[in-house]
From Swiss-Prot:
The keyword DNA-binding applies. It comes from Balaenoptera musculus (Blue whale). Acetylation of Lys-130 contributes to its nuclear localization and enhances its interaction with KPNB1. Deacetylated by HDAC3. The gene is SRY. Residues 54-122 bind DNA. This is Sex-determining region Y protein. Belongs to the SRY family. Interacts with CALM, EP300, HDAC3, KPNB1, ZNF208 isoform KRAB-O, PARP1, SLC9A3R2 and WT1. The interaction with EP300 modulates its DNA-binding activity. The interaction with KPNB1 is sensitive to dissociation by Ran in the GTP-bound form. Interaction with PARP1 impaired its DNA-binding activity. Residues 25-52, 169-204 are annotated as: Disordered. It is found in: Nucleus speckle; Cytoplasm; Nucleus.
Length: 204
């Protein structure tokens, strides 16, 4: 059976007795979704092992969804577990209070049994590790200002995390190319200016 243990329960005699009693646990106290946070109370050392784990009593929805989940899974073998959960949540909301009442009563009975069996039980949910958030969403597109390169306008966009790297490369290229381009673009203008001045002197 599941027990809340302390530091004195780790003797060989107690460990052997717990292993013999492990297969006699009632099938009432289990959660419908094994991957949820409705986990357990840990032992005295803060570690969770197979025998130290005490699950929360089922609520009314879990009591109702036990048989419903099996039924939906058998009728729709290709349906994913997440889709089944969404469907069950919708179906539960559509039930009337009278239809839900038997399951609330059963959940209350299970809660009382759990309280009598584990008087010192306290629910401690597991903390989920935070995932690093991206600076830009995957589908974002930032339209940048147009840049004047060799007298031609070229619009471009930055996407995702490559924006800074692309912009730095473009700025590096422009810093090297702009002086040469500026000089080459000014040469024809100076030539035309000198030619115009010579023609003007000849006419006068």
């Amino acid at each position: 059976m599941f027990r809340i243990v302390n530091g004195e329960d780790y003797s060989p005699e107690v460990q052997q007795r717990n292993s013999l009693d492990f297969g006699k646990a009632p099938s009432l106290l289990w959660t419908d979704n094994g991957g949820s946070n409705d986990r357990c109370e840990t032992g005295g050392n803060g570690r969770e092992s197979g025998q130290d784990r005490v699950k929360r009593p089922m609520n009314a929805f879990i009591v109702w969804s036990r048989d419903q989940r099996r039924k939906v899974a058998l009728e729709n073998p290709q349906m994913q577990n997440s889709e089944i959960s969404k469907r069950l949540g919708y179906d539960w909301k559509m039930l009337t209070e009278a239809e839900k009442q038997p399951f609330f009563e059963e959940a209350q009975r299970l809660r009382a049994m759990h309280r009598d069996k584990y008087p010192g039980y306290k629910y401690r949910p597991r903390r989920k590790a935070k995932r690093p958030q991206k600076l830009l969403p995957a589908d974002s597109s930032v339209l940048c200002s147009r840049m004047h390169i060799e007298e031609t306008l070229y619009p471009f966009t930055y996407k995702d995390g490559c924006a800074k790297a692309t912009r730095s490369r473009m700025e590096s290229r422009l810093s090297h190319s702009q002086p040469t381009n500026t000089t080459s673009s000014l040469l024809p203008q100076e030539h035309r200016s000198s030619w115009t001045s010579l023609s003007h002197n000849r006419v006068t």
